[in-house]
Amino acid sequence: MTKIYDKIFPKEPEFEDIKILHNSVRLSWIEPNVLLGKNNYNFDNFLPETKDLLVKLENGKSPLQKINCLNEIFKKITNIIQFNNQNDEFIGVDDSLPIFQYAVIKAQPIRLFSNYKYLNMYMNKELRNGPNDQLVTQIYVVGEFIKNVTYENFYGISKEQFNRNCTEAINNDMLSYIK
């Protein structure tokens, strides 16, 4: 699998990956309430674990390894929602997507789009059932959100505050390379 994978999966991030990564850095200042409209979620241990899983997604060679990482991420998201809502209601994309967006922005994966493309092209029919296909679609949706986000996509943020926070985040990131 490794020999084939090395030929079909790009060694370097594609242009779309770089756009997503750049905007993730720009958005590194966000807090959950800005995406969710509420601040009652407990994210203890979620971000480090999710970041580790996104690294596993990046390093996974087979579509099955990558899908398993996504399934683990969404199990964690489901647990957060159930824990914080204290109910057993059905959890849909509207509930999980903002938390996944938050996790991806904070984790800043290097090749999110490349992983989407790889899964979309090489995932076999047995894996391509409803839930797995939805996971792959959510990667795409999150990438598009991050690339195209404006202040209007967030709760309680003015255009000026959004621009100021994004500029500060980029400046801080650039300074971290100098130090």
Give the residues covered by each predicted segment.
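Short alpha-helical interface elements
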Residues: 21-29, 82, 124-129, 144, ...
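Alpha-helical catalytic/interaction cores of small GTPase-regulatory modules
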Residues: 56-152
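Acidic-enriched, low-complexity/disordered segments with a strong bias for Aspartate over Glutamate
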Residues: 6, 17, 44, 52, ...
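C-terminal regulatory/linker segments that are acidic, Ser/Thr- and Pro-rich
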Residues: 134-179
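Flexible domain-boundary/linker segments
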Residues: 14-17, 117, 156
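Catalytic and GAP-homology cores of small GTPase regulators
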Residues: 1-75
